[in-house]
Amino acid sequence: MVRSVWKGPFVEGSLLKKADAARASGRHDVIKIWSRRSTILPQFVGLVFGVYNGQKHVPVSINEEMVGHKFGEFSPTRTFHGHSGDKKAKKA
């Protein structure tokens, strides 16, 4: 389900403050965030965010194609180790 247009995109308030401070300082440090539900805005382009996936902060550098998506889309929370092999194929 898509968010209503009149509401606008959701962005955590602290995230905006951290991004503005990083832009003002000109430093390219990783900005640690826990808000996976926040929407990526055009003013975040060029910054690097450390998005928390439940274990660690995954570095995500923002480009123009990511605008409008959520931070959580770029930080997977589950690891897939593959299915077990076919036992019939091993015997033959």
UniProtKB/Swiss-Prot annotation:
Q: Name one GO biological process term.
A: translation
Record-linked PROSITE patterns: RIBOSOMAL_S19
Keyword tags: Ribonucleoprotein, Ribosomal protein, RNA-binding, rRNA-binding
SUPFAM superfamilies listed in its UniProt record: Ribosomal protein S19 (SSF54570)
Q: Which Pfam families match?
A: Ribosomal_S19
Q: Which domain of life is it from?
A: Bacteria
Gene Ontology CC: one annotated term: small ribosomal subunit
Record carries keyword Disulfide bond = no
Q: Which GO terms describe its molecular function?
A: rRNA binding; structural constituent of ribosome
List the PANTHER family. Answer: RIBOSOMAL PROTEIN S19P FAMILY MEMBER, SMALL RIBOSOMAL SUBUNIT PROTEIN US19M
Q: What does the UniProt record say this protein does?
A: Protein S19 forms a complex with S13 that binds strongly to the 16S ribosomal RNA.
Q: Which family does it belong to?
A: Belongs to the universal ribosomal protein uS19 family.
What's the name of the protein? Small ribosomal subunit protein uS19
